[in-house]
Amino acid sequence: NPFLTSSVVNTGSSISAKTQDGIGNYAFNYGTANNARAEIGDAAGNKQGSYTITDVDGRARRVDYVADAAGFRASVKTNEPGTALSAPASAAIVSPYAPPVAPVAPAVAAPALAAAPLLAAPGIASYSTLIGHGAPLGYPLGAGLLAPGFAKTYVW
């Protein structure tokens, strides 16, 4: 149920009204000699409204707005100085156009490949002064001869 109240104050008068249901839908408005506001809203949070302001020097503004899932949008109508539509100022272009420069990506070198490991030569387990000493099993005596008087044993 909307209710309407009005009161007279020594500086002017105002009027207001408000309604609201149990699920969150509402409407309200108020007004004085120099400004007014009205808004309706629903339980989903959508709002639509307007307000006006008039200054003593004659400047006036009216804003109509909508707030919903698409965001807040407003339309402003005013006679305030500097807001009238006019021809845009002409601007002289004094420098040539330079296209944007693409960012330079740092060069990344491929990792250096390590050389393949070399196979180790068979290690020498012992030296002997006896000729023929240290021949591997299954080889004839003296097969390990390195030089006259020296022989070595190979470990595979």
UniProtKB/Swiss-Prot annotation:
Signal peptide: none annotated. Pfam families: Chitin_bind_4. Residues 23-84 form the Chitin-binding type R&R domain. It comes from the Eukaryota. Disulfide bonds: none annotated. Keywords: Cuticle. Component of the rigid cuticle of the spider. This is Adult-specific rigid cuticular protein 15.5. It comes from Araneus diadematus.
